[in-house]
């Protein structure tokens, strides 16, 4: 018979038997219950919710086309002249790349001016596009039925397209006849048509009725550029990669099941009868190394929800009325007045038994997944002897890691407060107070602090001759000397909560072991070793003895302490609860002592759960103080819930339900770690060397985290997977290098490898996009600049820059290093002043006055009196930020324009002087578009002072990017606009139906005999 015992009132022997497939490298393990008299396996299995068979890495979403992200802005203008009113202004359009299109995941804003950084920047863009566009399928295009040439045609409903409503732009045309003609062209162009080829066929061999075919789709011409739509069209490929018809899943699950399992008939029928367009996550089967889970505390915590779902309790309890009646008789027989004991009995919480059991089970399975705060804990906690008794008994069956350090310190301080008030002799109290060992009892603020363990401080300053208080404190600390009690197991700096983990806040719990040395439950170690599973085990809650007896030494020792603590003969001053109630209180305490063995009912459940779950990857007995509390499940425990545990639980030998680890449990974290490795290799291949050859480790980890997060569609911080040790959350370069150098036995699963291949495919689209990105590899420094197209009908009237043909380069600064040298090298001008070499070169440039840039002739036409502008060219990456205004004839000075002066560049250099490669220098460019055709004012607009001052506002910038480099495309007519925004998209008439997290239950088929004890010497004697 094993230690979990026999079923209650039954003579059947029951054992847990591990079964695995023929190869020990296949790690998903099943644990089954086997009854000796039947010798068949009882099955209950479920596919893990967070597994590769029920979760896709990049879930495909469906969006109406109105929600599709646009890459370009359309800016309509009616071009006029600064010199006269144009009777029929020409309507044209400026096409501008949206500023924030590719700024996600720290792309443009954090680009550094260094070639490997540019490569990395582009690589991050690829992943950004993969997650943002290539996983969104266009599922809806709004349409209208209209009559065109006496035929009904389904056309695009332009009113639903906001700034892509081509009719809005047609309304900007100057003549009504032009507006009408343009709208007719729009109706005929943007229509719905049939599909000749199926956009997606899936790669599976399916019966004809459920195959994809052209008749299931429609094609639409929409006002988007082909580049914009091509990104979304890739989502169909992602759909094929990650999803399949339920028939494929059914076949996979049947092939995967052991000989004695079959997919539940009802679920199987649902999959077999699925029609076309129904999809499930495509199953992926890989042999994965579970040891990767142990490389990171985060990987363990990700299994926390799985741990909690595996907890099962089976507790037999007495009727609460029966318990209340029995206890009330004791209290009432011993007292003639109402007391707190009566109140506690009346408020006993039956549900608290389950709360306590589940809390302790969770705590022993893994001390790093959850923690408890003690409810109703204050300085007067031990005044209530029932609360104090329950709290101390809870300590006896709880590992210290289960209770937040803050609460453990407060418990000690509350006990110290009680001892000093009611048991400590006055001379001892006075000595402790005078020696600054304790604060005054009236200083409740300091007593409530968790900055120090006051009880331990008292112990260090007591003597054996101090009598009762020495005896009680010494026993509370298991009679260890004070120097061991104050010993620090984990310094506060190594914890996430900033409290020293001393022995003093661990000794009162469980076996009294230090929090770093809690005892593991090793009952299944032989199993795990023989199955190549790691040796991690749950925390041992109690010693299972022979004949299914659970050792209660810890509980009994604690109960003896409680009896002495509340012995009224020890009180120098009686607590309020003991005035006129000492007899009833003592009687109830005696009942506690007589009934404390009922805790066995809880310990049985804990031991059984520990035994049943010991093969799961989430089990551990090592406490990691560095794991932040906010990574854990938080629960508030009311110690008084222990009251019904003591008086209401009926111990029995109980075997828990089926112990069956979920299929593929832990694979999510394995895939994360394997993706980290694979994407690291992608980065290295793109750069020609490992990324840390060019960048700081923290920057690499940040970028790596972004890319892994995109592929997994969940926020991943790679640094949290690699720490100095399991007590820290600080990224460790050494741990990372060990991971990278480690030989991983299994390659990335094909699904994820294909997804990474898709990243390379997207690169083709990015090549087109990079040519219009607002990035240049050089810029210029001049004394003055400005563009003023006075008297013209050009689309651009003014800009805070120059045209390239206006620039005369007199000096070239080769790179960042040379710029730094010039800025930081000083030369003396005279005895009192000096300036940098860069300033010297700057002041050598000829200066052109602002009036020259805006000069005009008698007709108001621009007539600058200079041929070129001397400039210094700096070969360094820069980004321009475009701000666009429209001028409609008022010629009011625009709000303050952004201009970069040579001093700004100098400050930029000095602020980044310690960096080998600086951030990209950002240069704003303000542009005024010609929308004068909208103005019908008859005011003179030729050579007025107001117009002069208006154009002069655009002069003065000294660090510029030529206007020629700015991607601002001019489209001269609405017909050309329609040609540019003429994309097509195929949409399924009936959208796909996708079921994520599809649960599959296996049921038993036939008998499958197994050896009851497949491995010798496994179970304790």
From Swiss-Prot:
GO CC, any one term: host cell cytoplasm
InterPro entries: Inner_layer_core_VP3_Reovir, Innr_layr_core_VP3_Phytoreovir
Keyword terms of this UniProt record: Capsid protein, Host cytoplasm, Outer capsid protein, Virion
Pfam families: RDV-p3 (PF09231)
Recorded superkingdom: Viruses
Subcellular location: Virion; Host cytoplasm
GO MF entries: structural molecule activity
Function comment: Capsid protein which self-assembles to form the inner icosahedral capsid with a T=2 symmetry, and consisting of 60 P3 dimers.
Subunit and partners: Homodimer. Homomultimer.
Assigned protein family: Belongs to the phytoreovirus inner capsid protein P3 family.
Protein's recorded name: Outer capsid protein P3
Organism, scientific name: Rice gall dwarf virus (RGDV)
């Amino acid at each position: 018979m094993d230690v979990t015992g026999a079923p209650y009132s039954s003579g059947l022997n029951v054992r847990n038997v591990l079964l695995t497939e023929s190869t020990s490298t296949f790690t998903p393990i099943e644990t089954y219950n086997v009854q000796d008299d039947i010798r068949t396996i009882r099955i209950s299995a479920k596919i893990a919710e967070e597994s590769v068979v029920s979760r896709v890495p990049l879930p495909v979403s469906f969006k109406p086309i109105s929600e599709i992200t646009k890459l370009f802005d359309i800016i309509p203008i009616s071009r006029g002249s600064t010199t006269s009113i144009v009777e029929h202004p020409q309507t044209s359009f400026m096409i501008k790349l949206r500023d924030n299109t590719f700024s996600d995941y720290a792309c443009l804003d954090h680009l550094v001016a260094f070639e490997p950084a540019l490569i990395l920047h582009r690589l991050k863009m690829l992943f950004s596009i993969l997650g943002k566009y290539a996983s969104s399928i266009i599922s809806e295009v709004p349409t209208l039925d209209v009559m065109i040439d006496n035929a009904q045609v389904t056309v695009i409903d332009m009113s639903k397209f906001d700034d892509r409503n081509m009719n809005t732009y047609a309304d900007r045309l100057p003549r009504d006849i032009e507006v009408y003609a343009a709208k007719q062209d729009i109706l005929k162009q943007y229509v719905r048509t049939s599909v000749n080829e199926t956009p997606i066929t899936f790669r599976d061999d399916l019966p004809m009725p459920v195959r994809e075919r052209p008749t299931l789709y429609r094609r639409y011409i929409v006002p988007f550029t082909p580049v914009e739509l091509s990104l979304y069209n890739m989502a169909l490929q992602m759909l094929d990669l990650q999803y399949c018809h339920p028939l494929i899943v059914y076949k996979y699950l049947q092939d995967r099941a052991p000989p004695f399992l079959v997919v539940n008939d009802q679920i199987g029928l649902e999959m077999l009868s699925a029609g076309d367009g129904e999809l499930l996550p495509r199953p992926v089967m890989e042999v994965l190394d579970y040891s990767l889970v142990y490389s990171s505390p985060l990987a363990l915590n990700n299994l926390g929800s799985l741990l909690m779902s595996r907890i099962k309790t089976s507790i037999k309890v007495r009727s609460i009325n029966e318990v209340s009646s029995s206890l009330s008789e004791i209290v009432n027989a011993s007292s003639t007045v109402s007391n707190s004991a009566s109140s506690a009995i009346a408020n006993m919480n039956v549900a608290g038994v389950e709360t306590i059991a589940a809390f302790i089970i969770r705590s022993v399975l893994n001390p790093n997944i959850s923690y408890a705060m003690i409810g109703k804990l204050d300085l007067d906690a031990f005044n209530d002897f029932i609360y104090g008794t329950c709290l101390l008994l809870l300590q006896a069956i709880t590992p210290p890691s289960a209770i937040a350090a803050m609460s453990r310190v407060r418990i000690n301080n509350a006990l110290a407060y009680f001892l000093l008030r009611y048991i400590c002799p006055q001379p001892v109290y006075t000595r402790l107070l005078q020696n600054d060992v304790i604060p005054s009892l009236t200083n409740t603020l300091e007593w409530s602090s968790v900055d120090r363990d006051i009880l331990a401080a008292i112990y260090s300053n007591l003597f054996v001759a101090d009598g009762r208080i020495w005896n009680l404190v010494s026993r509370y600390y298991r009679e260890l000397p004070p120097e061991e009690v104050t010993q620090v197991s984990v310094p506060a700096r190594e914890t996430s909560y900033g409290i020293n983990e001393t022995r003093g806040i661990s000794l009162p719990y469980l076996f009294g072991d230090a929090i770093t040395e809690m005892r593991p439950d090793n009952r299944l170690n032989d199993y795990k070793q023989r199955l190549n599973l790691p040796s991690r085990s749950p925390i041992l809650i109690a010693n299972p003895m022979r004949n299914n007896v659970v050792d209660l030494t810890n509980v009994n020792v604690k109960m003896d302490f409680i009896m002495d603590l509340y012995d009224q003969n020890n009180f120098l001053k009686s607590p309020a609860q003991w005035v006129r109630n000492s007899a009833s209180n003592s009687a109830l305490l005696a009942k506690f002592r007589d009934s404390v063995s009922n805790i066995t009912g809880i310990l049985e459940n804990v031991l059984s759960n520990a035994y049943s779950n010991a093969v799961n990857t989430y089990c551990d007995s090592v406490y990691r103080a560095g794991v932040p509390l906010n990574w854990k499940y938080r629960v508030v425990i009311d110690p008084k819930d222990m009251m019904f545990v003591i008086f209401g639980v009926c111990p029995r030998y109980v075997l828990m339900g089926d112990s069956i680890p979920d299929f593929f449990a832990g694979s999510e974290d394995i895939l994360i770690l394997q993706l980290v490795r694979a994407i690291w290799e992608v980065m290295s291949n793109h750069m020609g060397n490992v990324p840390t050859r060019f960048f700081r480790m923290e920057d690499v980890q940040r970028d790596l985290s972004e890319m892994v997060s995109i592929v997994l569609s969940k926020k991943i911080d790679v640094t949290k997977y690699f720490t100095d040790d399991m007590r820290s959350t600080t990224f460790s370069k050494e741990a990372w290098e060990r991971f990278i150098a480690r030989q991983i036995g299994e390659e990335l699963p094909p699904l994820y490898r294909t997804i990474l291949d898709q990243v390379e495919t997207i690169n083709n689209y990015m090549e087109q996009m990079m040519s219009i990105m607002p990035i240049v590899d050089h810029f210029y420094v001049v004394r003055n600049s400005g563009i003023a197209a006075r008297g013209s009908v050009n689309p651009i009237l003014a800009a805070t820059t120059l045209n390239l043909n206006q620039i005369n380069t007199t000096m070239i600064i080769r790179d960042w290093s040379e710029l730094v040298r010039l800025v930081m090298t000083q030369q003396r001008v005279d005895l009192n002043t000096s300036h940098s070499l860069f300033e010297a070169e700057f002041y050598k440039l000829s200066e052109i006055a602002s009036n020259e840039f805006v000069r005009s002739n008698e007709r108001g036409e621009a007539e600058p009196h200079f041929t070129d502008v001397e400039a210094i060219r700096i070969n360094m990456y820069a980004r321009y930020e475009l701000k666009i205004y429209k001028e409609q004839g008022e010629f009011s000075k625009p709000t303050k324009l952004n201009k970069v002066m040579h001093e700004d560049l100098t400050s930029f250099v000095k602020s980044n002087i310690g960096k080998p490669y600086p951030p990209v220098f950002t240069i704003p460019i303000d542009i005024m578009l010609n929308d004068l055709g909208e103005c019908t004012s008859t005011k003179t607009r030729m050579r007025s002072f107001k117009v002069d001052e208006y154009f002069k506002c655009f002069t003065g910038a000294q660090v510029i990017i030529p206007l020629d480099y700015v991607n601002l495309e001019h489209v001269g007519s609405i017909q050309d606009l329609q040609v540019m925004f003429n994309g097509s998209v195929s949409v399924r008439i009936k959208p796909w139906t996708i079921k994520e997290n599809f649960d599959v239950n296996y049921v038993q088929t036939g008998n499958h005999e197994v050896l009851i004890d497949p491995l010798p010497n496994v179970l304790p004697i």
